[in-house]
């Protein structure tokens, strides 16, 4: 008899986005002529940068020759891409990160889940609330939590509320924790963390020998030069942090798949017997065993992001989406809604109207305006009463969605 992983049975009824898909499918079947505008899931809509497309076309042509063919590549990523990432994304900002500390992968969502493979089951875990659901669900699947309570919070996790009441600034844990998930710019709220705020987290982690798992997937959308793009801009972070990044949102690689994880050499964890163990070696072994690497063609496309042409085209993409965010902020504010985020991230975080909860507002927009967004309660108990709209769409769709919502 094949036994299932019982931890999966502890998951709530459905992962947030499949539940959205279920409701949208039911609506579409009942209203086949409705012209839906999707501002929910954070998928990009604009074409890949020309520099990336050209690089991938050239790589395909290389693969068509015996001399240029590439089979299995290094599980950690090709050296030329790792070196470009280290130089442009980290060393240019004063971060002491080498190419060897960068692991190229097929998604930061995957890596932020897979990192649990090298971390023990007894860790005390802190997440913000609201939170990107993957951080919580992956811990549930791995058996790192208890059951969920009526509010959807799992035993064994410390929830750190980020709401308008605390200016979306996560408080430091009131009890010691070992793993801390941070995402800035934040998904879903769009909030950012100042240098001083990040320093307080690094100081906490160093004091308590905790590990920060820092998701910087949206760092390219930061508009203020004073706001850090990386946890490694903070002194001491090499001794307490792992960072996840992605090419999905800045360069449109959601359908192409390329990301990276930074594991500094010398970053240590503790074994059950109290021995100090370097996490770089464990992650390297994990990737070498379970991952065959990102394709040569895709990595050449990612490398082109760092060319002069690629940088200009990526900047244009980011500006386009941030202009969409500005339109959403302006129009919904004019409609009398209370708006947060959307200034350094492609997400606008909306306070739902009085007397309407998150899923109620979802159904209201779906049925009355034919606009799809994301209920805040799907990101955690503290997200109840909020709603997320994404700036990832065409300008015409964003304009039309705002016109419909304002007409309600």
Swiss-Prot record:
GO molecular function list: L,L-diaminopimelate aminotransferase activity; pyridoxal phosphate binding
Residues where N6-(pyridoxal phosphate)lysine is found: 249
Catalysed reactions listed for this entry: (2S,6S)-2,6-diaminopimelate + 2-oxoglutarate = (S)-2,3,4,5-tetrahydrodipicolinate + L-glutamate + H2O + H(+)
Cofactor field: pyridoxal 5'-phosphate
InterPro entries: Aminotransferase_I/II_large, DapL/ALD1, PyrdxlP-dep_Trfase, PyrdxlP-dep_Trfase_major, PyrdxlP-dep_Trfase_small
GO biological process: lysine biosynthetic process via diaminopimelate, diaminopimelate-aminotransferase pathway
Family per similarity comment: Belongs to the class-I pyridoxal-phosphate-dependent aminotransferase family. LL-diaminopimelate aminotransferase subfamily.
Name by which UniProt lists this protein: LL-diaminopimelate aminotransferase
Taxonomic lineage: Bacteria, Bacillati, Cyanobacteriota, Cyanophyceae, Synechococcales
Gene: dapL
């Amino acid at each position: 008899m094949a036994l299932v992983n019982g931890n999966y049975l502890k998951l709530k009824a459905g992962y947030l986005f499949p539940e959205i898909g279920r409701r949208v499918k039911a609506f579409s079947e009942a209203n086949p002529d409705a012209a839906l505008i999707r501002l929910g899931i954070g998928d990009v809509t604009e074409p890949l940068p020309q520099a990336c497309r050209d690089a991938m076309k050239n790589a395909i042509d290389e693969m068509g020759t015996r001399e240029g063919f590439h089979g299995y590549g290094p599980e950690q990523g090709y050296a030329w891409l790792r070196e470009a990432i280290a130089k442009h994304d980290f060393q240019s900002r004063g971060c002491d990160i080498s190419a060897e500390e960068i692991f190229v992968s097929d998604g930061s969502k995957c890596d932020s889940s897979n990192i649990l493979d090298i971390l023990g089951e007894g860790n005390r875990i802190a997440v913000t609330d609201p939170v990107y659901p993957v951080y919580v669900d992956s811990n549930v699947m791995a058996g790192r939590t208890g059951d969920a309570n009526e509010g959807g919070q799992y035993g064994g996790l410390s929830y750190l509320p980020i709401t308008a009441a605390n200016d979306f600034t996560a408080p430091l844990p009131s009890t010691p924790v070992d793993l801390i998930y941070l995402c800035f710019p934040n998904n879903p709220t769009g909030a950012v963390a100042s240098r001083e705020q990040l320093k307080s987290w690094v100081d906490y982690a160093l004091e308590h020998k905790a590990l920060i798992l820092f998701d910087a997937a949206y760092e390219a959308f930061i508009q203020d030069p004073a706001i850090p793009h990386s946890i490694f801009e903070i002194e001491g972070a090499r001794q307490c942090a792992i960072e996840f990044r992605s090419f999905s949102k800045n360069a449109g690689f959601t359908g192409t798949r390329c990301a990276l994880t930074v594991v500094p050499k010398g970053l240590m964890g503790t074994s059950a017997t109290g021995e100090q163990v370097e996490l770089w070696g464990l992650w390297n072994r994990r990737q070498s065993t379970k991952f065959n690497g990102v394709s040569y063609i895709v990595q050449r496309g990612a490398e082109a992001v760092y060319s002069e042409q690629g940088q200009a085209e990526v900047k244009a993409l980011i500006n386009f989406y941030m202009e969409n965010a500005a339109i959403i902020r302006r129009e919904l504010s004019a409609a009398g809604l209370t708006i947060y985020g959307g200034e350094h991230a492609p997400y606008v975080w909306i306070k739902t109207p009085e007397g309407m909860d998150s899923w109620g507002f979802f159904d209201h927009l779906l049925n009355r305006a034919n606009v799809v967004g994301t209920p805040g309660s799907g990101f955690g108990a503290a997200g109840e009463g909020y709603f997320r709209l994404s700036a990832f769409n065409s300008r015409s769709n964003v304009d039309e969605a705002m016109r419909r919502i304002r007409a309600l």
